[in-house]
Amino acid sequence: MASRESGGSRAAALLLVLGVERALALPEICTLCPGGMHNLSRVAAYCEDTSKLMQARCCLNQKGTILGLDLQNCSLKDPGPNFLQAYTAIIIDLQANPLKDDLANTFRGFTQLQTLILPQDVPCPGGSNAWDNVTSFKDKQICQGQRDLCNSTGSPEMCPENGSCASDGPGLLQCVCADGFHGYKCMRQGSFSLLMFFGILGSTTLAISILLWGTQRRKAKAS
């Protein structure tokens, strides 16, 4: 009997430790706002429908990757520096916050985002052309279906010959160099030499240090 109780205590302690470790590993953006996720929010519904984990304000997969973020009614004027931790999110709710109008660069890198819920007076990042559907309600605005603008007419021509267009978030594009090319306009061929880069950086730093040392010595002698 004592053995069973001892085993049960160990199991409970192990579960407690695992729970603490999971809590400690929770991304900071998930606890930006006190309390848990709103039960009737679209993020909570998505999390339940896909059998994902709900922790604080986040919906996570088994690896701890953020798939949903519910920061509605958090008195946020700006999503903050940790918002980038949610770049893997598929759905984000920011309604009922006094956000600033321009959020274009806030969502740079959010290439997986498919549903974004904003205050009614805040436009969808990238404008209506960056989304399949933009729906306005009395208290919120919903941006759905992020478009890949690289597929739009004329967009691929913005990249050089050895580069290709890639989405970088709602309404945002970037040029990615093809394999074997790098540098300005992807014109340099071959692998990027880290040894050469750090060699040049080290030489430049050494030269500046010697120059500053010489200047200080001359000032010291003059005084």
Curated annotation (Swiss-Prot):
Residues 1-25 form the signal peptide. It is a single-pass membrane protein; Multi-pass membrane protein. It comes from the Eukaryota. GO terms for cellular component: lysosomal membrane; nuclear envelope; perinuclear region of cytoplasm; plasma membrane. Residues 215-223 are cytoplasmic. Coiled coil: none annotated. The keyword Acyltransferase does not apply. GO terms for biological process: cell differentiation; negative regulation of osteoblast proliferation; negative regulation of protein catabolic process; positive regulation of bone mineralization; positive regulation of osteoblast differentiation; regulation of gene expression; xenobiotic transmembrane transport. Keywords: Cell membrane, Differentiation, Disulfide bond, EGF-like domain, Lysosome, Membrane, Nucleus, Signal, Transmembrane, Transmembrane helix. The keyword Signal applies. Residues 146-187 form the EGF-like domain. It is found in: Nucleus envelope; Cell membrane; Lysosome membrane. Disulfide bonds join C150-C165, C159-C175, C177-C186. The chain crosses the membrane at residues 194-214. GO terms for molecular function: xenobiotic transmembrane transporter activity. InterPro entries: ATRAID, EGF-like_dom. Residues 26-193 are extracellular. Promotes osteoblast cell differentiation and terminal mineralization. Plays a role in inducing the cell cycle arrest via inhibiting CCND1 expression in all-trans-retinoic acid (ATRA) signal pathway. In osteoclasts, forms a transporter complex with ATRAID for nitrogen-containing-bisphophonates (N-BPs) required for releasing N-BP molecules that have trafficked to lysosomes through fluid-phase endocytosis into the cytosol. Interacts with NELL1; the interaction promotes osteoblastic differentiation and mineralization. Interacts with SLC37A3; the interaction is direct and both proteins are mutually dependent for their stability. This is All-trans retinoic acid-induced differentiation factor. It comes from Mus musculus. The gene is Atraid.
